[in-house]
Amino acid sequence: MVYSYTEKKRIRKDFGKRPKVLDIPYLLSIQLNSFKKFIQPDLSGQHGLEAAFRSVFPIRGYNGNSELQYVSYRLGETIFDVKECQIRGATYSAALRVKLRLVIYERDILEATVKDIKEQEVYMGEIPLMTNNGTFIINGTERVVVSQLHRSPGVFFDSDKGKTHSSGKVLYNARIIPYRGSWLDFEFDPKDNLFVRIDRRRKLPVSIILRALNYNTEEILNIFFEKNIFKIENNKIVLELVPERLRGETASFNIKKNGIIYVEKGRRITAKHIQELKNNKIKSITVPVEYILGRIVSKNYVDKKTGETIISSNTELSLEILEKLKKLGFYSIETLFTNDLDHGPYISETLRIDSSNDRMSALIEIYRVMRPGEPPTKEATENLFENLFFSEDRYDLSTVGRMKFNRSLLREETKGSSTLNKEDIIDVIKKIIDIRNGKGEVDDIDHLGNRRVRSVGEMAENQFRIGLVRVERAVKERLSIGDLDALMPQDMINAKPISAAVKEFFGSSQLSQFMDQNNPLSEITHKRRISALGLGGLTRERAGFEVRDVHPTHYGRVCPIETPEGPNIGLINSLSVYAQTNSHGFLETPYRKVCNGLVSEEIHYLSAIEEGNYIIAQANTNIDKTGFFTDDLVTCRHKGESSLFNRNQVNYMDVSTQQIVSVGASLIPFPEHDDANRALMGANMQRQAVPTLKTDKPLIGTGMERAVAVDSGVTAVAKRSGVVQYVDASRIVIKVDEKEMYSREAGIDIYNLTKYTRSNQNTCINQQPCVNLGEKIKKGDVLADGPSTDLGELALGQNMRVAFMPWNGYNFEDSILVSERVVQEDRFTTIHIQELSCISRDTKLGAEEISSDIPNVGEAALSKLDESGIVYIGAEVTGGDILVGKVTPKGETQLTPEEKLLRAIFGEKASDVKDSSLRVPNGVSGTVIDVQIFTRDGVKKDKRALEIEDMQLKKIKQDLTEEFKIFESSLFTHIKKTFISLDIETKQLDTLPFEKWFSVDIKQKDKKKEIEKLAKQHHELKEEFNKKIEIKRQKITQGDDLAPGVLKIVKVYLAVKRQIQPGDKMAGRHGNKGVISKINPVEDMPYDENGIPVDIVLNPLGVPSRMNIGQILETHLGMAAKGIGDKINHMLKTQEKISNLRKFIQKAFDLGDNLRQKVNLDTFSNEEILRLAKNLKNGIPISTPVFDGAQENEIKQMLKFAGLPTSGQIILFDGRTGEKFERPVTVGYMYMLKLNHLVDDKMHARSTGSYSLVTQQPLGGKAQFGGQRFGEMEVWALEAYGASYTLQEMLTVKSDDVNGRTKMYKNIVDGNHQMEPGMPESFNVLLKEIRSLGINIELESE
């Protein structure tokens, strides 16, 4: 395997056995591709903005004299970049400009001619843009639009599974779901009549919709029924026989022909009888009259002479009518063929309960259901029905819907009209009748072939279309009235409805969510999340168990492990590692093609629908070197079931063992040894890990760490290969390799790093370079580590030395005992940044003022403020300290005579304002690391704002000047090379200033041209530099666009350093979570025979019942990895020969059975071996891929190689007594995470505070500074103890006895420690509530 320069720094030993066939795809592609489709002009008009415009335009006026046509659109440039938008609280968006054409027609009697054409570009609002990392910046906060898994448009056949009716009868239904438009449902009732519902309104007999489609009774019966023809010959009734129709019936007479009896009376007709009738070619049989009576006639029989209807279709035959028909010469009678087995009389029965008898009455009936209370007119009823399913404006099945519709009805063609037609409705009714008759099956709603993914682009397009439709109405009216000659397209369009619809979607839709930015994994998982909730989806309350459950089609598409616990379980899922969506929005997963037992490298992506037709082998099936299956019988999946198949029957094979899990679950080592519930918790808790100050890669990983770190966008990744030319904490400069340079460019890439910024979860985002000067790097190499990454690998926690043993009850109930050394070494220390803002508004009484002149505040409180009233950077503040001094004018109050006198003498006006300063919230303390001031246009900037502006300008100028110098020096290197080739002395050149170099006289024409070219390049560079500085200067100095009524906003950023402490929550990666119970001194911790103490003591009882054995294997393998690292460290310290070091590390990498990883250290230079050894001395990092990890014997090999007992258990000594513990203890290294559930954020105490308005009881919760509720059960406890006075105190003065608590306060002030309980306020509330019911209660004192 070839390693790049940076990969050689630390190689992860891989225990994977299966060869890597397919690289992990870019993990954010679902977001980026979808949005790209939305904003990129699509010439076919199928997707994005183009599709939205084409579906609404052209807009015609009501009179048809004019129309507004769409030509094209373009997106403008963004005003601010991503970082500026975040700082200013702006939306990162671009203006949408659309070219429209207004065409005015001249109407003659015969034809319309074009009178005038006007074309103009029209502004249509702002479209939020996606950042490179798949997020949106909306009002300064980073948000993610989660993809939605919804029911695909099309037709679905389902049943109620016998739950609706008390008899338990299964009622079938069909539903046609369009992409937009009215739903059409068909359903059976318990009496087997078929009904139709439009948009879930009142049900109507299905015949009504058939009549509305212009079918009469006779035609309806013709469509849905087969006919029996009875002929009257010689006063006998003869049935034209179709033998198959007799199956299952009991003969009510002898079936005979030509004297031969084929079936005796009373016998059941079997397949044998039918075959006999067929063999003897019997076409007709004579039947008794009783057999025809009660049959239903399939057409109208009319007396030709009088025109009188003797019997109408769908009526039962009686003896009299039979006689009548015979008299009038009708010798052939058609009846409906029905039976109870597989030809039910459902439509015929339904026609009987239908009151309508022609098209008009059916349309009126539909109109009454859809628009109750409105008078139906012929035109209105026809329009309504036409618009429901047959108008492209109101109804759209979409290409996906049509494809699913046609597939469901087993049609060959998958394309067609996007509206419904007569045949569609009739075919659906036929299929549901077939299902009721026992032919065909109902669909599985939870099959991923019936659910599709709607991503950002598609949802944004739908919202945009809604906005356009709102505009369309207004445009139609404007086109129909007034003088069009004077109007331009600009005057027609109002952009507000469009931008409002888009803004509403991105700002407040259920699927546009505040990004979870705890760590890189939580970001990536959030972007890959798939939700069944949201607009057009399910609701938590109504979602049943089936929808939430794992379905066989989830395999390789949706992760069966990662889903939240609680009410959303199963409704919010995560995309599997290799899954992607196809053009129709269905999820597909890759498989390797297999032919006759030979596995090829060819890869096909299959959707859930396609997968059902194939036999698919698992990824861990044994294959020989040539690619053939070694076993004759192979475990495979087929139609959702697992079983053994012959190797030659197999069609496909899984690509990888981690194909079925999501990114989060693929980071858990040994999940094959964990219970599923615990793996779920492990996957979820990794997302809550807080980035630590010192990052530490996991010793035991899965090989996915690098992919997550690189794709998440938190690291700086090289765009092109080159050499590191300059590196410091805030920027990295790369000199690009010549072969990757564009023509006429300086060949320099500059990467500016993010320093100490706040994330959405108040954690700290900080990038640190991980390359050194002069290092060669390749495209895709990691240059700088972000939060929770270590040398380009995801590092969410720390490798801790753990022991599984009880320790004085401090690990009871999953508690965790931690060594003081962990705190001293800052292993779990994290930085949290909080943003506090102070807004100065213009009030009715005057403007609020930010100043340090605050009434009734002592000098000490103002000591950290500058003269503008704003805290200085670097100040250490605690709860209650003033950060920004602000005073608000208050209304004139009635003054007492004394105050009036004082006013008159001293002219004091200070009491006109009240203190409304920004203070540090309770329980928060930290250091001020940044202050930002935003001032409205036209408001004078204060001194501090100008200072900040100055500082920003200086910094930007310095940055840009440095950038310019880097580019310039690269240019002059080129020029120098040219001069050297002309034998010009470089010493002379160095004495000249740079600008003069271009004026050196050169004789050779080609070289002269080259120098001129470079001179031009230098000039362009300088111009661009000046332009950049000017743009930045304007952005900084211009006033800010603030909300109405806001004059100034001051934002203060506080950084808090939090060490780990008792009460903090910690967890491993296997769902093994707990709370720290005690930080124990190092000397008291258990230690081994070498005197090394353990860092953490965990409870061994937490393992067996939870069945997460993965943590034990991780601990053992971690111990081996660390042991090997210790040996390498020892070799480095004793300065062993490099050749010996190389041999030892090579041996370590070669350990294990038939590994796919082949590391050849002979290709490494001595320097590279030393650097590798230094990075391995803390433990050799190991990768054990999901479901393909290290085996038990391999772990033992590793332990043996490290010189450790293969049991993984060692003798420990008690730190306090020095005595041996009585048995060996499992000790090893486990990767532990500190979760974002810190005791500092949870701990809270109340003395006095605010009270609820109605009940006068203290509020609850930390945010309201509330108290602890003393509830019903707590009252019982005090009653049980007989503590009557304490109880009285709790229920009165400490709760809601208003007078009592005021008196008590006064008593305490006076030093009199007594209380007088009175009536609790809640009792008065109860009295008032009872009185509101009309019952009067009065309290009488005895």
Swiss-Prot record:
Tell me which positions the record assigns to the signal sequence. Answer: none
Q: Which PROSITE patterns match?
A: RNA_POL_BETA
Q: Name one GO molecular function term.
A: DNA-directed RNA polymerase activity
Recorded GO cellular component terms are: DNA-directed RNA polymerase complex
> Which principal EC class is assigned to this enzyme?
transferase
Is Cell cycle set as a keyword in this record?
no
Q: Which GO terms describe its biological process?
A: DNA-templated transcription
* Database matches in InterPro entries: DNA-dir_RNA_pol_bsu_ext_1_sf, DNA-dir_RNA_pol_bsu_external_1, DNA-dir_RNA_pol_su2, DNA-dir_RNAP_su2_dom, DNA-dir_RNAP_su2_hyb_sf, RNA_pol_bsu_bac, RNA_pol_bsu_CS, RNA_pol_bsu_protrusion
EC number of this enzyme: 2.7.7.6
Keyword terms:
DNA-directed RNA polymerase, Nucleotidyltransferase, Transcription, Transferase
Q: Which reaction does it catalyse?
A: RNA(n) + a ribonucleoside 5'-triphosphate = RNA(n+1) + diphosphate
**Cited Gene3D superfamilies:** 2.40.50.100, 2.40.50.150, 3.90.1100.10, DNA-directed RNA polymerase, beta subunit, external 1 domain, DNA-directed RNA polymerase, subunit 2, domain 6, RNA polymerase alpha subunit dimerisation domain, RNA polymerase Rpb2, domain 2
* UniProt superkingdom: Bacteria
Give one Pfam family, short name only: RNA_pol_Rpb2_2
The SS bond pairs are none
Belongs to which family? Belongs to the RNA polymerase beta chain family.
Kindly give the NCBIfam families that the UniProt entry links to this protein. PRK00405.1 (NF001616), rpoB (TIGR02013)
List the PANTHER family hit by this protein, alphabetically. DNA-DIRECTED RNA POLYMERASE I SUBUNIT 2
Role noted for this protein: DNA-dependent RNA polymerase catalyzes the transcription of DNA into RNA using the four ribonucleoside triphosphates as substrates.
Q: Which named protein is this?
A: DNA-directed RNA polymerase subunit beta
Please name the source species: Buchnera aphidicola subsp. Acyrthosiphon pisum (strain APS)
